[in-house]
Amino acid sequence: MRALAVTGRITQLTRFRFVNCFLVQEQDGLTLVDTALQAAEQILAAAERLGAPIVRIALTHGHGDHVGSLDALKRALGAEVQVLMPEPDAQIHAGERPKTKGGWPKLATAPDVRFEPGVRIGSLEAVASPGHTSGHVSFLDTRDRTLIAGDVFTSYGGVAVSSRLHLRFPFAAMATADPRQNLESARALRALAPSLLLVGHGPAVPGPAVAMERAISRASR
């Protein structure tokens, strides 16, 4: 698993070349955003290298490539870690509403907190960005406006909106439940004027305004 410090406070961890999760440094420890898959040992090792404990796991959405290491991490960390999942996706995992497109693995771990957009998780503000899943959220780091956009956008092979198939990385679009809603979310995220774009699949994109706008334009055709 490749670890790359993308800001002074955020480390991007990449599994299988194109599946990302993020360790965000806070005063009380680390927030892990998403968990990749089959990566618990590597994530724990990365946290150890940073010299801080993982105190919470905040999920952008409930697809398997974002929650795939959750059970193993919860077993390793126990009550020391708080798990937070967007309410609609938590309902799907609990069997309270039907599954949508994409992989929804069976989880032994129930979230400690089901949250709605607008909440603050440490320095991260949860921003509504539904479409890829009904509950999908993004996280804006209020300290420097770094945006963790989950699967609203991808950047593997170039920045793209996950509302339309991108030949170099089609998988996110194939798993998007509502492409039109996802496109509206992409526009809303662009309006936040992030300083850095981080996504679930692909490299970090500094100064992303032009790339986001072009991706939105392509997806709108």
Can you annotate each of these PLM segments?
Residues 1-49, 139-150, 155:
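Conserved beta-strand hairpin/beta-sheet module of binuclear metal-dependent hydrolase folds
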Residues 8-13, 33-36, 59-60, 124-128, ...:
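Short, flexible loop segments at the rims of nucleotide/cofactor-binding pockets, characterized by
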Residues 14-17, 129-133:
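A short catalytic or substrate-binding loop motif that flags glycine-/basic-rich loops and adjacent residues
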Residues 31, 58, 83, 146-148, ...:
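Residue-level marker for buried hydrophobic side chains located in beta-strands
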Residues 38, 125-128, 134-210:
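Metallo-beta-lactamase
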Residues 38-121:
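Active-site HxH/HxHxD metal-binding segment of metal-dependent hydrolases
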Residues 98-107, 162-171, 219:
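Short glycine/proline- and charge-enriched loop/turn segments
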Residues 206-221:
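Binuclear metal-ion centers of metallo-dependent hydrolases, dominated by the metallo-beta-lactamase
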